[in-house]
A protein has these predicted regions:
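Interfacial helix-cap and linker-helix signal at transmembrane-aqueous boundaries
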Residues: 24-25, 56-57, 144-152
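Extracytoplasmic gate region of multi-pass secondary transporters
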Residues: 1-51, 140
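Intracellular helix-loop hinge segments at the cytoplasmic ends of transmembrane helices
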Residues: 22, 108-116
Length: 182
């Protein structure tokens, strides 16, 4: 279950990292030089998530990982729905930072590896989850070019948004499986 969640996270993370700079040049008409600051805000937000998400899950949600995945899924979906309608650089830049933070759910997923594998097997679990992230990254590279050429820019963001809704559903399923096991 968490491998599917990880794969979706890889599609979202690398889909945004790959296609946002191209979106700025093609859809917003910015040169690479003009759009570079905006494009950098996405990975800066993702880096922040790696520290913020585990902290929030531990301090606010008392070690429960699922509420953070749920919050991240909903905010990422809403951001993906809104992003294609933003037509100027400053709001797009702010949105990219926010999306970078919330789309980067692997900060929570790596913590789940410790929950699932314990001290003995957490590295093995991380390896499996990281493999799934990489497979998601590879899938987006193959599929999103076709999606963009066939359906246009909004379809890429809508696809990522819909995938985060699937991530949300998978999180609820994983939560139910976890409570049944206990």
């Amino acid at each position: 279950m968490f491998c599917l969640i990880s794969a979706i996270a890889g599609i979202g993370r690398y889909g945004l990292l790959t296609w946002v700079p191209t979106y700025f040049t093609e859809a917003l008409g910015l040169s690479i030089k003009d759009g570079i600051f905006s494009s950098i805000l996405l990975p800066v937000g993702q880096a922040c998530a790696m520290f913020v998400f585990p902290l929030i899950t531990d301090k606010v949600f008392k070690g429960k990982r699922e509420p953070m995945l749920i919050l991240a899924s909903v905010i990422t979906f809403l951001g993906m729905v809104c992003f294609p309608f933003i037509k100027s650089q400053l709001p797009a830049s702010i949105m990219l930072f926010v999306l970078g933070v919330f789309a980067m759910v692997t900060g929570v997923i790596w913590a789940i590896a410790g929950d699932l594998g314990g001290r003995a097997f957490s590295s093995t679990i991380v390896g499996g989850l990281d493999w799934a992230v990489c497979m998601g990254a590879a899938m987006q590279a193959v599929v999103f070019g076709f999606v963009k050429d066939t359906f246009g820019w909004p379809a890429i963001f809508a696809t990522i948004g819909c995938l985060y809704i699937i991530l949300l559903v998978l999180t609820f399923v994983a939560r139910k499986m976890k409570t049944k096991r206990i």
